[in-house]
């Protein structure tokens, strides 16, 4: 019964990762497309060529994943027909990096409205988001590939270290963009945040040491996680998570938070411009249905030794009982579980930070309709700082077509060739982009896959603006 309850909790953690948008280290061609209103997400100071914009539900869909080094082709040996024939854990262990990063993102913007005022552009946006990432070191893969025989001696432990950070929330953003002078533009957005779910690891590590003389196994582990999940989950009298079977929508608004986006854009002349931006600077205060999970080696009998699990082997008689007596085997396995307890408990309020993003960009306009850009970007994730360097070209044709090509370099990821296309038809802008064309042909062997599509409506036509010969946005006649 307890295992069934635990499975439900694990399922909830996975769902919290999958639902919404994970703002991982994704650089999208949308960020550079001058006709796409959603470029303002990366640069709130940009002067959009529109009088007004609106979208409901269909404005922005985003799907993607990040995987620095875990590759399908490295896990298997293949037959002559190219089908997996054998799992090769040692080959897989040799292929991973010292630190491996995984992420997933899927997004929907529920409502967007931009409206130009006398002095600038008012922006309103409501969306559902998650920010999620996981980090795994190579210790677990080395242990599976080579066994404990590769870790003999006190100075040579197998170290398994992992971290997981997932946050699901709603975001209501209100902002303003203004042209301070002909050369300087500023932009900001204030964000009201409403947390839906959070899972964070403070510690998730283990050490396994093999004695050089007796080959006894010594295991030390420490797990500390905290979570805030919807009210459908609670800790029952046995100390395990359980479900109530119903969900209260109002709970989605009981974990408040706040964030800001800030940006400045400066045009040196008609060719050169520069952008600096800080986005997703904020926090969420978790106060509803919080609990923690901890695990340390427990003193449950003969295998406990000064805080460690020490396994010296078992006798022949005991081995025969384990092999032949089902009841004895179940009791023996249950006794081993007592050494590795999972303890759940209610906990107080806590805060988590958003994954703040820093951006520096330089633009060179060859002509008013052809722009080259170079961008340095970095995001502070729960598992560390994730930098990226992007080269981009964006062309505007016939005043209604945008084509954008990007190349992005990230740690352990150098094959990210992106392409974006948008077409403005009367009162709507249809766009389709990806940050990695190669990834669509080899999804299980790519470090990054992303697709972003949407339809945005340009209201109050014919007041839509365009880029004139001087490179400045102007109204259509």
Predicted ranges, named:
Residues 54-67, 124-130, 188-194, 221-232, ...:
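Transmembrane beta-barrel strands of outer-membrane/channel proteins
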Residues 52-54, 120-122, 183-186, 271-274, ...:
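Repeated loop/turn-to-beta-strand initiation elements of outer-membrane beta-barrel proteins
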Residues 23-130, 134:
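N-terminal, post-signal peptide beta-strand-biased segments of exported outer-membrane/organellar beta-barrel
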Residues 33-38, 352-356, 365, 371, ...:
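Solvent-exposed loop/turn segments connecting transmembrane beta-strands
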Residues 98-102, 135-168, 228-234, 406-477:
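Outer-membrane beta-barrel translocator/channel fold
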Residues 38-40, 104-109, 166-172, 256-260, ...:
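Residues that define the transmembrane beta-barrel architecture of outer-membrane proteins
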Residues 44-46, 106-115, 124, 172-178, ...:
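Residues on the lipid-exposed face of transmembrane beta-strands in outer-membrane beta-barrel proteins
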Residues 65-69, 132-137, 195-201, 211-212, ...:
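Outer-membrane beta-barrel proteins
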């Amino acid at each position: 019964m307890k295992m069934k309850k635990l499975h439900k909790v694990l399922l909830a953690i996975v769902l919290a990762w999958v639902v919404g948008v994970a703002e991982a280290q994704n650089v999208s061609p949308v960020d550079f497309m001058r006709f796409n209103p959603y470029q303002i997400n990366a640069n709130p100071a940009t002067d959009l060529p529109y009088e007004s914009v609106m979208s409901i539900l269909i404005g922005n869909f985003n799907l993607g994943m990040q995987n620095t080094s875990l590759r399908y082709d490295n896990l298997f040996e293949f037959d002559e027909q190219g089908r997996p024939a054998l799992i090769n854990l040692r080959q897989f262990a040799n292929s991973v990096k010292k630190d491996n990063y995984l992420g997933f993102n899927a997004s929907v913007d529920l409502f967007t409205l931009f409206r130009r005022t006398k002095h600038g552009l008012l922006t309103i946006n409501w969306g559902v988001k998650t920010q999620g990432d996981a980090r795994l070191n190579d210790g677990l893969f080395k242990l599976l590939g080579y066994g404990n025989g590769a870790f003999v001696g006190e100075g040579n432990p197998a170290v398994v270290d992992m971290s997981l950070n997932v946050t699901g929330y709603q975001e209501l953003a209100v902002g303003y963009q203004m042209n301070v002078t002909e050369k300087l533009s500023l932009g900001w957005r204030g964000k009201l945040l409403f947390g839906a779910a959070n899972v964070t690891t403070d510690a998730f590590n283990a050490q396994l040491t093999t004695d050089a003389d007796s080959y006894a196994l010594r295991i030390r582990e420490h797990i500390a996680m905290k979570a805030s999940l919807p009210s459908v989950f609670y800790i029952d009298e046995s100390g395990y998570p359980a479900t109530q079977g119903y969900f209260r929508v109002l709970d989605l608004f009981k974990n408040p938070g706040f964030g800001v986006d800030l940006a400045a854009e400066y045009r040196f002349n008609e060719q050169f411009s520069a952008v600096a931006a800080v986005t997703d600077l904020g926090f969420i205060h978790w106060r509803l249905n919080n609990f923690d999970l901890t695990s340390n080696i427990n003193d449950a009998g003969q295998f406990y030794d000064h805080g460690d699990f020490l396994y010296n082997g078992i006798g022949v008689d005991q081995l025969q009982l384990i092999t032949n007596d089902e009841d004895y085997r179940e009791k023996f396995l249950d006794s081993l579980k007592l050494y590795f307890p999972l303890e759940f408990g209610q906990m107080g309020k806590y805060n988590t930070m958003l994954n703040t993003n820093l951006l520096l960009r330089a633009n060179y306009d060859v002509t008013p309709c052809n722009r080259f850009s170079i961008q340095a970007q970095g995001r502070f994730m729960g598992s560390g700082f994730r930098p990226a360097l992007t080269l981009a070209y964006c062309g505007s044709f016939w005043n209604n077509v945008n084509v954008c090509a990007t190349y992005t370099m990230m740690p352990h990821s150098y094959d990210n060739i992106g392409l974006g296309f948008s077409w403005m038809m009367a009162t709507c802008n249809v766009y389709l982009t990806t940050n990695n064309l190669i990834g669509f042909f080899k999804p299980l062997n790519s470090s990054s896959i992303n697709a972003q599509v949407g339809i945005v409506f340009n209201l109050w036509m014919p007041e839509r603006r365009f880029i004139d010969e001087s490179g400045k946005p102007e109204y259509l006649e």
